[in-house]
Amino acid sequence: KEKKITPNKTSAKPEVTIANGRIQMNSTLLVGSSHTTPWWNGKLKTNFLKKASPAITRFVPGREGLGLTDRMDSVIGYMIQKNILVFDQNYGLWYDRRRDDHERVRRRDGDVWGPFYEQPFGRSGQGTAWEGLSKYDLNRPNAWYWSRLKEFAEKGNKDGLLLFHENYFQHNILEAGAHWVDCPWRSTNNINQTGFPEPAPFAGDKRIFVADMFYDITHPVRRELHRQYIR
């Protein structure tokens, strides 16, 4: 008689709670430091890669490793070795490393430089954004970005590691004007009619302060985009 094989039941996911201000997993206190992801800068030269740190949504086509497209198991190993408990995730300050020059000019072409700091939104294939690629569609999630976060969260969870995802990035909407010019939410960079003034309202021809407009949920289009994004 053929032996019947019963598949193993998947174990329940660890339960993470906050009790008396302390983060616990399955009632056990979690202890360790945090790692804030790089969100700008970077070079592809070998001597620079030695000094790089993990960034799970950094992308370099065809190349893997620290400072490039990080291997997720290597990121987890890095955190365990250095007693890091939390990976604090931000999307990139900008996608194209040419903007590291902090200029506010429109790029004349889409000859972008890596490493690329991925954004949570996908491209529309329509029009031309400030950095020379197609405009974003804020209703279209960047599947690669979110799949990378999901992969880290699932694999890291097995080793008691946590992912803190920052839904928003104040650096884009305050301070240096270059932080705003390539932002997916800027009206000229998307197909969603976000309603931010164009040309960009630089203060003193340099700084940007659009936080009040950005978080103004009385604007019907932006309110719905925020709702879809954070749900």
Which residues does each PLM region occupy?
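Non-catalytic propeptide/linker segments at domain boundaries
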Residues: K1-R22
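Active-site mouth of glycoside hydrolases
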Residues: T17-R231
